[in-house]
Amino acid sequence: MKRLLWVDDEIDLLRPHLLFMQGRGYHVDAVSNGDDALELLRLSPYDLILLDEQMPGRSGMEVFDELRRMDARVPVVMVTKSEEDRTMTEAIGRRVADYLVKPTSPRQVLSVVTRLLEGGKIQQQLVARDFASRFRDLNAQRNLPRGWREWCETYSELVDWELRLRDAGETGLLASLETLLDDFRREFCRFVCDDYGAWVNGGPDRPPLSTDIVPQYLAPLLGEDRTVLFVIIDCLRLDQWRALMPILEPFAQVEEAQYYSILPTATPFSRNAIFSGLFPDQISERVPGWWGWDGEGSLNSFEGELFREQVRRVMGTNLPVHYEKVFDAGDGEAMLRRLPSHLAQPGVTAIVFNFVDQLTHGRSESAVLMEVARDKEALRALTRQWFERSEALVAIRDAVLRGVPVLVTTDHGSIHCHRPATVFAKRDTTQNLRYKFGDDLRAEDRSTAFSTNDERTLRFPAGRAATNYLIALEDVFFVYPTKLRQYQARYRGSFLHGGISPEEMVLPVALLTRR
Protein backbone atom coordinates (compact mmCIF):
# COMPACT_ATOMS: atom_id res chain seq x y z
CA MET A 1 0.00 0.00 0.00
CA LYS A 2 1.38 3.43 -1.02
CA ARG A 3 1.90 5.83 1.90
CA LEU A 4 0.92 9.50 1.60
CA LEU A 5 1.67 12.36 3.99
CA TRP A 6 -0.71 15.36 3.77
CA VAL A 7 0.43 18.60 5.44
CA ASP A 8 -2.14 21.43 5.72
CA ASP A 9 -3.09 23.82 8.54
CA GLU A 10 -6.75 23.30 7.53
CA ILE A 11 -6.49 19.53 7.48
CA ASP A 12 -9.84 19.11 9.28
CA LEU A 13 -11.58 20.62 6.26
CA LEU A 14 -9.97 18.01 4.02
CA ARG A 15 -11.51 14.92 5.66
CA PRO A 16 -13.57 14.12 2.52
CA HIS A 17 -10.36 14.16 0.48
CA LEU A 18 -8.57 11.90 2.99
CA LEU A 19 -11.43 9.40 3.07
CA PHE A 20 -11.62 9.41 -0.72
CA MET A 21 -7.89 8.63 -1.05
CA GLN A 22 -8.11 5.92 1.62
CA GLY A 23 -11.03 4.41 -0.26
CA ARG A 24 -8.78 4.24 -3.32
CA GLY A 25 -6.26 2.10 -1.48
CA TYR A 26 -3.80 4.68 -0.18
CA HIS A 27 -2.59 4.94 3.42
CA VAL A 28 -2.81 8.63 4.36
CA ASP A 29 -1.24 10.32 7.39
CA ALA A 30 -2.46 13.89 7.95
CA VAL A 31 -0.82 16.66 10.01
CA SER A 32 -1.51 20.38 10.39
CA ASN A 33 2.03 21.81 10.50
CA GLY A 34 5.51 21.37 9.10
CA ASP A 35 7.19 20.33 12.35
CA ASP A 36 4.88 17.34 12.78
CA ALA A 37 5.44 16.41 9.15
CA LEU A 38 9.22 16.44 9.56
CA GLU A 39 8.93 14.31 12.70
CA LEU A 40 6.82 11.68 10.90
CA LEU A 41 9.27 11.65 8.00
CA ARG A 42 12.12 10.97 10.40
CA LEU A 43 10.24 7.92 11.73
CA SER A 44 9.29 6.32 8.41
CA PRO A 45 9.47 7.02 4.66
CA TYR A 46 6.55 8.12 2.50
CA ASP A 47 5.85 7.57 -1.19
CA LEU A 48 4.44 11.08 -1.75
CA ILE A 49 3.85 14.28 0.24
CA LEU A 50 1.05 16.82 -0.30
CA LEU A 51 2.26 20.12 1.18
CA ASP A 52 0.28 23.33 1.78
CA GLU A 53 2.27 26.35 0.61
CA GLN A 54 0.75 28.89 3.06
CA MET A 55 0.81 27.76 6.73
CA PRO A 56 1.34 29.61 10.03
CA GLY A 57 4.85 29.29 11.39
CA ARG A 58 7.03 27.53 8.87
CA SER A 59 5.86 28.20 5.33
CA GLY A 60 5.40 25.41 2.86
CA MET A 61 8.56 26.42 0.99
CA GLU A 62 10.62 26.30 4.20
CA VAL A 63 9.23 22.87 5.04
CA PHE A 64 9.89 21.75 1.47
CA ASP A 65 13.57 22.71 1.74
CA GLU A 66 13.88 20.72 4.99
CA LEU A 67 12.05 17.74 3.46
CA ARG A 68 14.47 17.78 0.54
CA ARG A 69 17.44 17.63 2.89
CA MET A 70 15.91 14.61 4.63
CA ASP A 71 14.72 12.78 1.50
CA ALA A 72 15.70 14.14 -1.90
CA ARG A 73 13.73 11.52 -3.83
CA VAL A 74 10.20 11.63 -2.39
CA PRO A 75 7.82 13.50 -4.75
CA VAL A 76 6.20 16.59 -3.24
CA VAL A 77 2.98 18.15 -4.55
CA MET A 78 2.61 21.81 -3.55
CA VAL A 79 -0.98 22.86 -2.72
CA THR A 80 -1.72 26.60 -2.49
CA LYS A 81 -4.44 29.23 -2.59
CA SER A 82 -2.18 31.57 -4.55
CA GLU A 83 -2.60 31.80 -8.31
CA GLU A 84 0.33 34.17 -8.72
CA ASP A 85 2.87 33.22 -11.37
CA ARG A 86 5.68 33.99 -8.92
CA THR A 87 4.52 31.31 -6.49
CA MET A 88 4.19 28.72 -9.23
CA THR A 89 7.56 29.65 -10.74
CA GLU A 90 9.29 29.36 -7.36
CA ALA A 91 7.72 25.97 -6.71
CA ILE A 92 8.70 24.64 -10.12
CA GLY A 93 12.17 26.13 -9.74
CA ARG A 94 12.62 24.16 -6.52
CA ARG A 95 11.61 21.00 -8.38
CA VAL A 96 8.28 20.19 -6.82
CA ALA A 97 6.72 17.20 -8.56
CA ASP A 98 3.42 19.00 -9.25
CA TYR A 99 1.38 22.04 -8.28
CA LEU A 100 -2.32 22.29 -7.27
CA VAL A 101 -4.38 25.46 -6.68
CA LYS A 102 -7.09 25.40 -3.99
CA PRO A 103 -9.90 24.62 -3.88
CA THR A 104 -9.15 21.11 -5.06
CA SER A 105 -11.55 18.26 -5.62
CA PRO A 106 -10.76 14.73 -4.40
CA ARG A 107 -10.53 13.57 -8.02
CA GLN A 108 -7.97 16.27 -8.85
CA VAL A 109 -5.79 15.03 -6.02
CA LEU A 110 -6.28 11.41 -7.07
CA SER A 111 -5.30 12.26 -10.64
CA VAL A 112 -2.03 13.88 -9.57
CA VAL A 113 -1.14 11.15 -7.08
CA THR A 114 -1.97 8.38 -9.56
CA ARG A 115 0.15 10.00 -12.27
CA LEU A 116 3.15 10.40 -10.00
CA LEU A 117 2.99 7.02 -8.26
CA GLU A 118 1.31 4.76 -10.80
CA GLY A 119 1.96 6.56 -14.08
CA GLY A 120 4.91 4.43 -15.12
CA LYS A 121 3.05 1.20 -14.44
CA ILE A 122 -0.07 2.41 -16.26
CA GLN A 123 1.98 3.56 -19.26
CA GLN A 124 3.74 0.21 -19.36
CA GLN A 125 0.42 -1.62 -19.38
CA LEU A 126 -0.99 0.61 -22.11
CA VAL A 127 2.15 0.36 -24.26
CA ALA A 128 2.03 -3.42 -24.00
CA ARG A 129 -1.67 -3.48 -24.88
CA ASP A 130 -1.31 -1.06 -27.79
CA PHE A 131 1.70 -2.88 -29.22
CA ALA A 132 0.00 -6.26 -28.99
CA SER A 133 -2.88 -4.86 -31.03
CA ARG A 134 -0.63 -3.09 -33.55
CA PHE A 135 1.70 -6.08 -33.83
CA ARG A 136 -1.07 -8.17 -35.35
CA ASP A 137 -1.67 -5.54 -38.02
CA LEU A 138 2.01 -5.08 -38.81
CA ASN A 139 2.61 -8.81 -38.93
CA ALA A 140 -0.25 -9.23 -41.40
CA GLN A 141 1.19 -6.43 -43.58
CA ARG A 142 4.73 -7.79 -43.84
CA ASN A 143 4.52 -8.89 -47.45
CA LEU A 144 2.30 -6.12 -48.80
CA PRO A 145 3.87 -3.98 -51.55
CA ARG A 146 5.18 -0.63 -50.33
CA GLY A 147 6.53 2.47 -52.00
CA TRP A 148 9.32 4.58 -50.54
CA ARG A 149 6.88 6.72 -48.53
CA GLU A 150 5.28 3.67 -46.92
CA TRP A 151 8.71 2.30 -46.05
CA CYS A 152 9.60 5.57 -44.31
CA GLU A 153 6.36 5.43 -42.33
CA THR A 154 6.77 1.76 -41.43
CA TYR A 155 10.38 2.04 -40.33
CA SER A 156 9.65 5.24 -38.39
CA GLU A 157 6.83 3.47 -36.56
CA LEU A 158 9.03 0.47 -35.74
CA VAL A 159 11.70 2.79 -34.32
CA ASP A 160 9.11 4.53 -32.14
CA TRP A 161 7.80 1.19 -30.87
CA GLU A 162 11.32 0.11 -29.98
CA LEU A 163 11.91 3.26 -27.95
CA ARG A 164 8.52 3.05 -26.21
CA LEU A 165 8.88 -0.64 -25.35
CA ARG A 166 12.43 -0.08 -24.11
CA ASP A 167 11.28 2.79 -21.87
CA ALA A 168 8.47 0.58 -20.54
CA GLY A 169 10.90 -2.29 -19.80
CA GLU A 170 8.96 -4.70 -22.02
CA THR A 171 11.85 -6.99 -22.94
CA GLY A 172 9.57 -9.82 -24.04
CA LEU A 173 7.71 -7.63 -26.51
CA LEU A 174 11.01 -6.18 -27.71
CA ALA A 175 12.01 -9.68 -28.80
CA SER A 176 8.79 -9.92 -30.84
CA LEU A 177 9.48 -6.50 -32.36
CA GLU A 178 13.02 -7.54 -33.28
CA THR A 179 11.69 -10.58 -35.13
CA LEU A 180 9.23 -8.35 -36.98
CA LEU A 181 11.99 -5.89 -37.83
CA ASP A 182 14.11 -8.71 -39.27
CA ASP A 183 11.25 -9.61 -41.62
CA PHE A 184 10.66 -6.01 -42.66
CA ARG A 185 14.39 -5.45 -43.18
CA ARG A 186 14.49 -8.39 -45.59
CA GLU A 187 11.58 -6.98 -47.60
CA PHE A 188 13.10 -3.50 -47.55
CA CYS A 189 16.32 -4.83 -49.07
CA ARG A 190 14.38 -6.47 -51.89
CA PHE A 191 12.56 -3.21 -52.50
CA VAL A 192 15.81 -1.22 -52.72
CA CYS A 193 17.52 -3.80 -54.95
CA ASP A 194 14.59 -3.62 -57.37
CA ASP A 195 14.16 0.16 -57.46
CA TYR A 196 17.50 1.83 -56.66
CA GLY A 197 18.79 1.89 -60.24
CA ALA A 198 15.68 3.78 -61.34
CA TRP A 199 15.95 6.24 -58.44
CA VAL A 200 19.45 7.40 -59.34
CA ASN A 201 18.85 7.43 -63.09
CA GLY A 202 15.89 9.77 -63.27
CA GLY A 203 13.02 7.35 -62.68
CA PRO A 204 9.60 8.67 -61.64
CA ASP A 205 8.47 9.09 -58.03
CA ARG A 206 11.84 8.55 -56.41
CA PRO A 207 12.44 9.40 -52.75
CA PRO A 208 14.49 12.39 -51.64
CA LEU A 209 18.11 11.20 -51.75
CA SER A 210 21.40 12.51 -50.37
CA THR A 211 21.75 14.67 -53.48
CA ASP A 212 18.45 16.42 -52.68
CA ILE A 213 19.21 17.65 -49.15
CA VAL A 214 20.48 21.09 -50.17
CA PRO A 215 18.00 21.90 -52.97
CA GLN A 216 14.94 20.42 -51.23
CA TYR A 217 15.53 21.20 -47.54
CA LEU A 218 18.29 23.81 -47.19
CA ALA A 219 17.68 26.11 -50.17
CA PRO A 220 14.19 27.24 -49.02
CA LEU A 221 15.84 28.61 -45.86
CA LEU A 222 18.51 30.58 -47.74
CA GLY A 223 18.39 34.12 -49.10
CA GLU A 224 20.37 37.35 -49.35
CA ASP A 225 19.46 38.53 -45.85
CA ARG A 226 19.06 35.14 -44.17
CA THR A 227 21.37 33.19 -41.89
CA VAL A 228 21.18 29.39 -41.61
CA LEU A 229 23.12 26.76 -39.67
CA PHE A 230 23.48 23.37 -41.41
CA VAL A 231 24.57 20.53 -39.10
CA ILE A 232 25.55 17.03 -40.21
CA ILE A 233 26.12 14.44 -37.48
CA ASP A 234 27.98 11.67 -39.29
CA CYS A 235 26.61 8.11 -38.94
CA LEU A 236 23.42 8.89 -36.99
CA ARG A 237 20.63 6.32 -37.12
CA LEU A 238 16.98 7.35 -36.92
CA ASP A 239 16.62 5.79 -33.46
CA GLN A 240 19.68 7.70 -32.23
CA TRP A 241 18.20 10.94 -33.56
CA ARG A 242 14.91 10.24 -31.79
CA ALA A 243 16.87 9.75 -28.56
CA LEU A 244 18.36 13.24 -29.01
CA MET A 245 15.08 15.04 -29.70
CA PRO A 246 14.03 15.39 -26.02
CA ILE A 247 17.24 17.38 -25.43
CA LEU A 248 16.32 19.82 -28.21
CA GLU A 249 12.58 20.18 -27.69
CA PRO A 250 12.70 22.43 -24.57
CA PHE A 251 14.12 25.28 -26.69
CA ALA A 252 13.37 24.30 -30.31
CA GLN A 253 10.42 23.42 -32.49
CA VAL A 254 11.43 20.28 -34.39
CA GLU A 255 10.00 19.41 -37.81
CA GLU A 256 11.31 16.01 -38.89
CA ALA A 257 11.23 14.32 -42.29
CA GLN A 258 13.11 11.33 -43.67
CA TYR A 259 15.23 10.83 -46.76
CA TYR A 260 17.23 7.96 -48.28
CA SER A 261 21.01 7.74 -48.38
CA ILE A 262 22.59 6.85 -51.70
CA LEU A 263 24.62 3.64 -51.98
CA PRO A 264 27.04 2.67 -50.62
CA THR A 265 25.89 4.09 -47.28
CA ALA A 266 29.37 5.32 -46.41
CA THR A 267 30.85 8.77 -45.88
CA PRO A 268 32.87 9.00 -49.14
CA PHE A 269 29.69 8.59 -51.15
CA SER A 270 26.73 9.76 -49.07
CA ARG A 271 28.29 12.84 -47.46
CA ASN A 272 29.91 13.97 -50.69
CA ALA A 273 26.50 13.61 -52.33
CA ILE A 274 24.95 15.91 -49.71
CA PHE A 275 27.58 18.63 -50.05
CA SER A 276 27.84 18.45 -53.83
CA GLY A 277 24.28 17.59 -54.83
CA LEU A 278 25.92 15.16 -57.26
CA PHE A 279 26.30 11.43 -57.73
CA PRO A 280 29.81 9.90 -57.75
CA ASP A 281 30.08 9.89 -61.56
CA GLN A 282 29.23 13.61 -61.66
CA ILE A 283 31.73 14.47 -58.92
CA SER A 284 34.42 12.55 -60.80
CA GLU A 285 33.76 14.67 -63.89
CA ARG A 286 34.08 17.92 -61.93
CA VAL A 287 37.04 16.90 -59.72
CA PRO A 288 39.57 14.95 -61.81
CA GLY A 289 41.47 12.42 -59.72
CA TRP A 290 38.78 12.32 -57.02
CA TRP A 291 37.67 8.76 -57.75
CA GLY A 292 39.75 5.92 -56.36
CA TRP A 293 39.44 2.75 -54.33
CA ASP A 294 42.27 3.44 -51.92
CA GLY A 295 42.33 5.92 -49.07
CA GLU A 296 38.62 6.51 -48.55
CA GLY A 297 39.29 9.39 -46.19
CA SER A 298 40.79 11.48 -49.00
CA LEU A 299 37.52 11.23 -50.95
CA ASN A 300 36.00 13.79 -48.55
CA SER A 301 38.77 16.36 -48.97
CA PHE A 302 36.74 18.57 -51.31
CA GLU A 303 33.50 18.91 -49.30
CA GLY A 304 33.86 22.63 -48.62
CA GLU A 305 34.51 23.48 -52.26
CA LEU A 306 31.72 21.20 -53.48
CA PHE A 307 29.29 22.75 -50.99
CA ARG A 308 30.11 26.32 -52.05
CA GLU A 309 29.68 25.37 -55.69
CA GLN A 310 26.33 23.70 -55.00
CA VAL A 311 24.96 26.67 -53.05
CA ARG A 312 26.00 28.98 -55.87
CA ARG A 313 24.42 26.65 -58.45
CA VAL A 314 21.15 26.18 -56.56
CA MET A 315 20.71 29.78 -55.40
CA GLY A 316 22.08 31.48 -58.51
CA THR A 317 24.19 33.86 -56.43
CA ASN A 318 27.34 33.91 -54.30
CA LEU A 319 26.03 33.64 -50.75
CA PRO A 320 28.62 33.57 -47.93
CA VAL A 321 29.38 29.91 -47.13
CA HIS A 322 31.37 28.66 -44.12
CA TYR A 323 32.38 25.03 -43.73
CA GLU A 324 33.65 23.42 -40.50
CA LYS A 325 34.59 19.84 -39.63
CA VAL A 326 34.80 18.82 -35.95
CA PHE A 327 36.82 15.71 -35.14
CA ASP A 328 37.72 16.42 -31.51
CA ALA A 329 37.29 18.84 -28.62
CA GLY A 330 39.97 21.17 -29.96
CA ASP A 331 38.18 21.48 -33.29
CA GLY A 332 34.91 22.05 -31.44
CA GLU A 333 36.28 24.83 -29.25
CA ALA A 334 37.80 26.58 -32.26
CA MET A 335 34.52 26.27 -34.16
CA LEU A 336 32.55 27.77 -31.25
CA ARG A 337 34.90 30.77 -31.17
CA ARG A 338 34.22 31.46 -34.85
CA LEU A 339 30.50 30.64 -34.86
CA PRO A 340 29.08 33.89 -33.36
CA SER A 341 30.56 35.98 -36.18
CA HIS A 342 29.16 33.55 -38.77
CA LEU A 343 25.68 33.66 -37.22
CA ALA A 344 25.74 37.46 -37.06
CA GLN A 345 25.81 37.84 -40.84
CA PRO A 346 23.80 36.46 -43.77
CA GLY A 347 24.90 33.15 -45.27
CA VAL A 348 25.09 29.48 -44.39
CA THR A 349 27.45 27.73 -42.00
CA ALA A 350 27.85 23.97 -42.42
CA ILE A 351 29.36 21.93 -39.59
CA VAL A 352 30.20 18.22 -39.70
CA PHE A 353 30.46 16.39 -36.35
CA ASN A 354 32.35 13.09 -36.56
CA PHE A 355 31.99 11.72 -33.02
CA VAL A 356 29.24 9.15 -33.66
CA ASP A 357 31.08 7.82 -36.73
CA GLN A 358 34.32 7.60 -34.73
CA LEU A 359 32.48 5.81 -31.93
CA THR A 360 30.96 3.31 -34.36
CA HIS A 361 34.27 2.59 -36.08
CA GLY A 362 36.24 2.54 -32.83
CA ARG A 363 33.85 0.04 -31.29
CA SER A 364 35.00 -2.64 -33.75
CA GLU A 365 38.63 -2.08 -32.78
CA SER A 366 38.28 -1.65 -29.00
CA ALA A 367 37.18 -4.34 -26.55
CA VAL A 368 36.24 -1.62 -24.05
CA LEU A 369 33.99 0.22 -26.51
CA MET A 370 32.53 -3.09 -27.67
CA GLU A 371 31.52 -3.81 -24.08
CA VAL A 372 30.17 -0.33 -23.38
CA ALA A 373 28.19 -0.08 -26.65
CA ARG A 374 27.17 -3.70 -26.88
CA ASP A 375 23.74 -3.16 -28.47
CA LYS A 376 21.41 -0.55 -29.97
CA GLU A 377 20.19 0.68 -26.60
CA ALA A 378 23.73 1.22 -25.32
CA LEU A 379 24.73 2.97 -28.55
CA ARG A 380 21.77 5.33 -28.19
CA ALA A 381 22.69 6.03 -24.57
CA LEU A 382 26.32 6.82 -25.47
CA THR A 383 25.19 9.06 -28.31
CA ARG A 384 22.86 10.94 -25.98
CA GLN A 385 25.56 11.32 -23.32
CA TRP A 386 27.95 12.74 -25.91
CA PHE A 387 25.36 15.11 -27.34
CA GLU A 388 24.36 16.54 -23.95
CA ARG A 389 27.97 17.72 -23.42
CA SER A 390 28.93 18.38 -27.03
CA GLU A 391 29.89 21.43 -29.02
CA ALA A 392 27.12 20.33 -31.40
CA LEU A 393 24.44 21.09 -28.81
CA VAL A 394 26.08 24.40 -27.90
CA ALA A 395 26.17 25.46 -31.55
CA ILE A 396 22.58 24.39 -32.23
CA ARG A 397 21.21 26.07 -29.10
CA ASP A 398 23.13 29.28 -29.77
CA ALA A 399 21.77 29.48 -33.31
CA VAL A 400 18.17 28.65 -32.38
CA LEU A 401 18.09 31.17 -29.51
CA ARG A 402 19.39 33.83 -31.91
CA GLY A 403 16.45 33.07 -34.19
CA VAL A 404 18.65 31.34 -36.78
CA PRO A 405 17.00 28.24 -38.32
CA VAL A 406 19.06 25.05 -38.01
CA LEU A 407 18.83 22.14 -40.44
CA VAL A 408 20.12 18.92 -38.86
CA THR A 409 20.73 15.70 -40.75
CA THR A 410 23.18 12.84 -41.19
CA ASP A 411 24.86 11.15 -44.14
CA HIS A 412 24.19 7.50 -43.28
CA GLY A 413 23.30 5.23 -40.39
CA SER A 414 24.73 1.91 -39.23
CA ILE A 415 23.51 -1.61 -38.55
CA HIS A 416 24.34 -4.17 -35.88
CA CYS A 417 25.91 -6.95 -37.97
CA HIS A 418 25.71 -10.57 -36.86
CA ARG A 419 26.04 -12.71 -40.01
CA PRO A 420 29.32 -13.19 -41.88
CA ALA A 421 29.15 -13.88 -45.61
CA THR A 422 32.13 -15.21 -47.55
CA VAL A 423 33.25 -13.36 -50.67
CA PHE A 424 35.89 -14.34 -53.19
CA ALA A 425 38.00 -11.68 -54.84
CA LYS A 426 41.38 -10.63 -56.08
CA ARG A 427 43.47 -8.47 -53.79
CA ASP A 428 42.60 -5.17 -55.46
CA THR A 429 39.25 -4.70 -53.75
CA THR A 430 37.89 -2.16 -51.28
CA GLN A 431 38.42 -2.89 -47.59
CA ASN A 432 34.95 -1.99 -46.28
CA LEU A 433 33.09 -4.90 -44.67
CA ARG A 434 29.69 -3.89 -46.11
CA TYR A 435 30.63 -3.20 -49.74
CA LYS A 436 33.27 -4.47 -52.16
CA PHE A 437 34.44 -3.28 -55.58
CA GLY A 438 36.89 -5.30 -57.63
CA ASP A 439 37.63 -7.69 -60.45
CA ASP A 440 36.33 -11.25 -60.40
CA LEU A 441 34.35 -10.53 -57.23
CA ARG A 442 31.49 -12.74 -56.07
CA ALA A 443 29.58 -13.73 -52.94
CA GLU A 444 29.43 -17.38 -51.95
CA ASP A 445 25.74 -16.94 -51.10
CA ARG A 446 24.14 -14.60 -53.63
CA SER A 447 21.23 -13.84 -51.30
CA THR A 448 23.56 -11.92 -48.96
CA ALA A 449 24.48 -9.15 -51.41
CA PHE A 450 23.25 -6.80 -54.09
CA SER A 451 25.53 -7.53 -57.04
CA THR A 452 26.06 -5.67 -60.29
CA ASN A 453 28.79 -5.12 -62.87
CA ASP A 454 27.07 -2.04 -64.32
CA GLU A 455 28.43 1.12 -62.71
CA ARG A 456 25.42 3.07 -64.01
CA THR A 457 23.23 1.23 -61.48
CA LEU A 458 25.16 3.02 -58.70
CA ARG A 459 26.05 6.16 -60.70
CA PHE A 460 29.75 5.36 -60.35
CA PRO A 461 32.39 6.61 -62.79
CA ALA A 462 33.21 4.22 -65.59
CA GLY A 463 35.87 1.92 -64.19
CA ARG A 464 38.06 -0.85 -65.39
CA ALA A 465 36.63 -3.70 -67.40
CA ALA A 466 35.11 -6.61 -65.49
CA THR A 467 34.62 -4.59 -62.30
CA ASN A 468 32.05 -6.08 -59.93
CA TYR A 469 30.18 -4.31 -57.14
CA LEU A 470 28.85 -6.08 -54.05
CA ILE A 471 26.75 -4.36 -51.38
CA ALA A 472 25.77 -6.30 -48.25
CA LEU A 473 22.11 -6.82 -47.40
CA GLU A 474 20.40 -6.84 -44.00
CA ASP A 475 22.86 -7.53 -41.13
CA VAL A 476 25.58 -9.24 -43.20
CA PHE A 477 29.29 -8.40 -43.18
CA PHE A 478 31.78 -9.68 -45.75
CA VAL A 479 34.74 -11.91 -44.89
CA TYR A 480 37.35 -13.59 -47.07
CA PRO A 481 38.09 -17.33 -46.98
CA THR A 482 41.56 -16.57 -45.64
CA LYS A 483 41.51 -15.90 -41.87
CA LEU A 484 37.80 -16.68 -41.95
CA ARG A 485 37.36 -17.53 -38.27
CA GLN A 486 39.54 -14.66 -37.12
CA TYR A 487 37.49 -12.04 -38.96
CA GLN A 488 34.18 -13.64 -38.05
CA ALA A 489 35.06 -13.43 -34.36
CA ARG A 490 36.49 -9.92 -34.64
CA TYR A 491 33.61 -8.24 -36.44
CA ARG A 492 30.53 -10.21 -35.42
CA GLY A 493 28.33 -7.86 -33.40
CA SER A 494 29.91 -4.72 -34.88
CA PHE A 495 27.96 -1.67 -35.96
CA LEU A 496 28.89 -1.22 -39.62
CA HIS A 497 27.70 0.80 -42.58
CA GLY A 498 27.98 0.83 -46.34
CA GLY A 499 25.23 -1.67 -47.08
CA ILE A 500 21.49 -1.84 -47.64
CA SER A 501 19.17 -1.73 -44.63
CA PRO A 502 16.61 0.75 -43.29
CA GLU A 503 18.97 1.49 -40.39
CA GLU A 504 21.60 2.73 -42.86
CA MET A 505 19.36 4.29 -45.51
CA VAL A 506 16.22 5.83 -43.94
CA LEU A 507 17.56 8.94 -42.24
CA PRO A 508 16.30 12.04 -40.42
CA VAL A 509 16.42 15.57 -41.75
CA ALA A 510 15.01 18.07 -39.27
CA LEU A 511 14.37 21.81 -39.17
CA LEU A 512 14.88 23.44 -35.75
CA THR A 513 13.40 26.85 -35.02
CA ARG A 514 13.00 28.90 -31.83
CA ARG A 515 10.00 28.13 -29.63
Describe the function of each predicted region.
Residues 11-29:
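Two-component/phosphorelay signaling modules centered on CheY-like receiver
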Residues 32-36, 59-62:
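Acidic catalytic/metal-coordinating carboxylates
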Residues 39, 61-72:
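Short amphipathic alpha-helix used as the core "switch/output" element in two-component signaling
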Residues 45-50:
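Active-site beta3 strand of CheY-like receiver
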Residues 54, 86-89, 114, 119-515:
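Feature captures the catalytic ectodomains and active-site-proximal regions of enzymes
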Residues 62, 83-98:
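Alpha4 helix (beta4-alpha4-beta5 surface) of REC/receiver domains from two-component response regulators
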Residues 104-113:
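C-terminal output helix
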